[in-house]
Amino acid sequence: MSAQRIFLIVFFYIYIHFSHGFTEKDDICWHDPYINNYSKCSFMESQQFLICFNGLKDEWKAKAENVQILILCKWPKVKFNPYDVLRGFTSLRKLTIANSNLTQLSTAFPIEAQFLENLKITDTKLHTFPKDAFSNLRSLRYLDLRNNALEEINVKAFNMLALKHIFLTGNPLRCTEDTAWILDPNEGSASSKVVDKDKLLCATPYDGRPLLPIVEIIATLKEECKQTVCNCELIYVIAAGMFTQKQIIAFASVDCSHRNLTEMPIFLPANTSTLRLTGNKIKDLTPLTTNPYYKSVQDLYMDDNLVESIGRLEGSDWLDRFRLLNLRGNKLIDLPTYALENALLHNSNVAGLYLGNNSWTCDCHFTPSFQDLLIRHSNLVKDINDIRCALTSDNDNSNKQIRDLTRTEICISVDEDSWFYPLDILNIVLASLIFLMFGKLLYDYWFFKKTGKLPSISKNMC
């Protein structure tokens, strides 16, 4: 007997001993006794056990009706056609396909495999199979699909009464609302059959996060979003501890832009961190300070609305913890610079402030402190070049960048300017007369010292 055959028989007994499947330690498909890529099979008649590497030749299908256990290692094709490959395997009870590059089951399993109880397709590149792939397997009780490339699963594929145990770990599953079937608690549901659902992990964009709590958050967000006129999306999540929903911090984005709203929404879904209200007709920002649903809002896009004042935010907790505030294109003419300055100094979260395209007042009362704020926090004010004086016909500063104004331009009005030059001329004339008088005094003193005579004007006075 050849060494290869002895080696293979040893592994047959290992497999029989672990009749419920392989462990990673002793999986026979990772111990190929054949050093080349030729198709080779061996059959243990006493156990009705057939194992094949690199494909299944037709010559072995002649013995198919006697095979109860079939192992296919290193399947050479990217597609696996169950209908064609398994035709004639009428006694098959257990099928394993492992350590292969197959990507697709191209057909459903044939009716001849109706007695198949244990199906294991593991460590392949399988990413898709028909929704009726297992519909003919009325005896199937154990389905192992671990360590494949499955991103989405059609839950209808698991709709068999006999099926009791499903394994799915090691697949890059997408965590979307389409995966909400995994939350179904009802007995007999597909979810109740997934043995390892607590170990399932999400793929992009929530790489490595636990699937169950993420899908639960997404499902809850979808339901709560129905109470608004907005679009809602889970942006990202971070783990705050063990992988349970209560220990995952979620960040959701709610987009209510261009909805013709006249006030901020009364209700927001849980975990709303980004709120977009662009292009509405909102005037009042009070809900940021009074409505508890806004507690988690960090990024607020309020551009192109009708906001005239942010005075309501002065001294509020929200102003001390916001991350982004966009007030471009509103009706602002001024703001409480001291309150905003204080918030920017003490808020370690703030990353962006947008104030451009508003009709800002440019006068000596408001603008100097506002200009100082803009220059001091130019790294946070992202649209500083668009922050300009109101566009008017009677102001020399009309539409000028506030950052670049001089104090003279800010604090001297046109009316004041008309009085400035006459007074200046008068001051110059008076100063000149003083210098002339002082010069005449010095001359007279010098003349007296030289001649001992008083100047003529002094004689006349005497």
Where are these regions (language model features)?
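Extracellular leucine-rich repeat
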Residues: S2-C462
